[in-house]
């Protein structure tokens, strides 16, 4: 039997193992809140209770009975801002997350100050917890508690930090808020599921290790340093569950891998150029006789992309890209057959995709590369009004999405060379951070447990694959995540001595408009998409399946 060795709050003073968590009394309390949430919503699929033992059926029933309270838990989290790029609410959020783990009964909970990172900026705290339940197997849970800022508050239908429930067809209730789907909604569904299990049975079927970062929207710079400095804290886990959700059509995926992403800032200044304003912005009337660093910056950016902005014009940019496997091509075709581009575009919040062909769109989304303009600033930044300014400096932010076998540092090197070739040697290039790609074998214990949960919940899903790669597979598509720090497969860069573990990324439920106005998480499901109660049941079923306490799926009959 494998037991999870627990540690005291001061790691350097700890020896030996703490006893497992005492068994809590079984819950008999009635629901305490009255939001009127319908656990099943209008979802057409239901769990097959014949496939799970009574102990899991009791957890499912508890989730249904307490779903109002569980939604309120998410609302409380949404109301706490946690914006990593500005720092707003980060210390309070770290304490809040630590409180979640304390309430769950984890014997060790600690907030780590990671200090200054290799990129020169201080990292945000990492919240770490170990929960010894006396179980044979240990599941690691990755979280991010930070969110993007709110850049267009007037575009929101409800205040972004209120957590308001609204109707959004086809769903009778969704929760609107910053971080609703990315990623407080799916993560609170995990926590609610674990709380439900402990409320019903007093003990979880698996031990848990939580790693919650506050820098996901800052290229994971703090987590990267944490893993480098404390690889021993990750030891002992048998697998990882990363939060996830269904696709808009209701499919479940496995994920676990990740694309690569490198983030840079480009700056054009009068000082470096030797022309235009140098010390500060000057009066705009001087443009009649003075060069403009701002116009130079615009011309520079235009030289790096095609006229439509969709193809990087950087020599050697695509060198090293691996072709898709036969299975990946087939998986894309299968997914394309189930994809409604109009619905997908509405959920993301775009007028249309670059391509009107579902296969091409999915291929771009899952395995494509890009050079994005995230933002640009300099000079008169006030909306409306007037004011003549000739800026002395303009800076723009950019992310490059890349795939195996490209690397972030090589992309930045090629960008620098292209700028020099185009006549922009004066333009400054600053790397903000890099998240290398990671491949994943989804046919592992965590993946098989997630698949078993999908079977129990009647969620359509694909097959587990040893050659899964960086993404794909039915679930909702997303961006990068720091899989390279945790996975045991091929990665773009290895940064610590930690050997890594099998990973499964997926879940029930759905949300959309991450990073955008009116970000949402589905509370009452519809069609083949579960709401929050269904998402929690997937987590509970996965935990019991990982522990070996849900029987194998029944054999199909002819």
Regions found by a protein language model. Give the residues of each.
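Sec-dependent signal peptide recognition
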Residues: 2-8
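C-terminal motif of bacterial Sec signal peptides marking the signal peptidase cleavage site
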Residues: 14-16
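Bacterial signal peptide processing site
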Residues: 18-20
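N-terminal hydrophobic or amphipathic helices/low-complexity stretches enriched
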Residues: 22-89
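A non-catalytic alpha/beta surface segment that caps or lines the substrate-entry region
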Residues: 73, 83-137, 162, 169
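Active-site metal-coordination/substrate-binding segment of hydrolases
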Residues: 136-212
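Fold-level recognition of mixed alpha/beta catalytic cores in primary-metabolism enzymes, strongest
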Residues: 179-194, 198-356, 362-369, 520-532, ...
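An extended, acidic, His-containing surface patch that forms the Zn2+-binding/catalytic region
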Residues: 249, 313-393, 401-414, 422, ...
């Amino acid at each position: 039997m494998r037991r999870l060795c627990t540690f005291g709050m001061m790691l350097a003073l700890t020896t030996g193992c703490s006893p497992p968590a005492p068994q809590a009394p079984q819950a008999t309390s009635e629901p305490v809140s009255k939001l009127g949430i319908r656990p099943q919503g209008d979802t057409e699929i239901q769990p097959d209770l014949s496939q799970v033992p009574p102990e899991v059926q009791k957890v499912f029933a508890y989730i249904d009975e307490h779903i109002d309270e569980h939604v309120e838990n998410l609302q409380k989290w949404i109301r706490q801002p946690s914006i990593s790029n500005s720092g707003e609410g980060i210390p309070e959020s770290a304490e809040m997350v630590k409180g979640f783990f304390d309430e769950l009964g984890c014997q060790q909970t600690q907030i780590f100050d990671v200090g200054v990172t290799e990129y020169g900026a201080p990292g945000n705290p990492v919240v770490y917890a170990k929960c010894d339940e006396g179980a044979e197997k240990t599941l690691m849970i990755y979280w991010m508690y930070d969110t993007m800022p709110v850049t267009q508050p007037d575009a929101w239908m409800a205040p972004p930090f209120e957590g308001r429930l609204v109707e959004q067809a086809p769903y009778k209730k969704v929760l609107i808020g910053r971080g609703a789907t990315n990623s407080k909604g799916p993560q609170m569904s995990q926590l609610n599921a674990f709380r439900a299990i402990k409320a019903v049975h007093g003990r979880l079927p698996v031990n848990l290790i939580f790693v919650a970062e506050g820098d996901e929207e800052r290229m994971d710079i703090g987590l990267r340093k944490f893993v480098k400095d404390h690889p021993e804290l990750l030891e002992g886990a048998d697998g990882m569950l990363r939060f996830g959700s269904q696709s808009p059509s209701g499919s479940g995926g496995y994920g676990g891998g990740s694309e690569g992403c490198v983030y840079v800032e480009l700056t054009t200044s009068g000082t470096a150029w030797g022309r235009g304003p140098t010390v500060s912005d000057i009066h705009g009337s001087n443009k009649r006789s003075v060069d403009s660093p701002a116009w130079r910056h615009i011309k520079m950016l235009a030289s790096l992309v095609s006229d439509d902005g969709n193809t990087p014009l950087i020599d050697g940019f695509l060198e090293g890209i691996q072709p898709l496997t036969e299975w990946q091509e087939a998986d894309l075709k299968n997914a394309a057959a189930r994809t409604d581009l109009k619905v997908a575009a509405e959920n993301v919040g775009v007028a249309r995709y670059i391509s009107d062909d579902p296969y091409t769109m999915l291929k771009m989304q899952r395995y494509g590369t890009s050079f994005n303009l995230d933002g640009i600033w300099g000079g008169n930044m006030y909306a409306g009004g007037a004011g003549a300014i000739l800026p002395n400096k303009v800076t723009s932010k950019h992310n490059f999405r890349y795939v195996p076998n490209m690397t972030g540092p090589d992309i930045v090197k090629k960008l620098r060379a292209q700028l020099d070739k185009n006549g922009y040697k004066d333009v400054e290039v600053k790397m903000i951070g890099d998240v290398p790609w990671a491949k994943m074998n989804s046919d592992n214990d965590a993946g098989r447990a997630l698949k078993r949960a999908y079977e129990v919940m009647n969620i359509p899903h694909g097959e587990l694959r040893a050659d899964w790669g960086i993404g794909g597979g039915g679930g909702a598509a997303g961006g990068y995540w720091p899989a390279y720090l945790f996975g045991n497969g091929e990665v773009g860069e290895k940064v610590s001595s930690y050997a890594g573990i099998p990973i499964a990324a997926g879940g029930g439920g759905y949300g959309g408009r991450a990073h955008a106005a009116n970000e949402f998480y589905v509370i009452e499901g519809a069609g083949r998409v579960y709401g929050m109660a269904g998402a929690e049941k997937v987590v509970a079923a996965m935990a019991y399946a990982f522990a070996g306490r849900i029987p194998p799926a029944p054999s199909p009959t002819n």
